[in-house]
């Protein structure tokens, strides 16, 4: 954290030395490599930033933090085609139509039950600084008992996850698929936005696959 603060204060040379020391202490710590690459990008050393990303990814293929930052660096270098090849949004971004569980009359009733459960959840917190939600509430884990209607949603999401992984399984050389886990665990949380509510730009570094389901919109 001190290293990041030094960078923000403009102490770039000291910050670079400190980053190198931090990486030397724990070469596997992805966040240190991302922050170092970010510093290099800020001071106009984009090629060095790319080198940091590529060297780490040789040892940790498919790491989401360095892969994501590598696309940013590539765009800064003007290599948009290579960046888009990694992102491959048309290939990896999929949509699924949520099916109505058997014990609900229709999908609207199911969504209403999910909304009601979320609004009454004891873990709802106002825009926690540890998360990306702003002007809204953010819940904790919704798959802990009592799950309520989220138990039915859990089964649906797991089936979609399995289908997604099977459909893309042949693309074994892409960084995203290199990081695909053998076993998958699902985590679900909810967000309730007010007027001007939004999410800060972010990724989920501990996750392989992320998705969103809008229960209710204005």
How would you label these PLM feature ranges?
Residues 25, 59-60:
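Structural marker of alpha-solenoid helical repeat scaffolds
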Residues 83-177:
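Non-heme Fe(II)/2-oxoglutarate
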Residues 148-158, 162-218:
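Catalytic core of non-heme Fe(II) oxygenases with the double-stranded beta-helix
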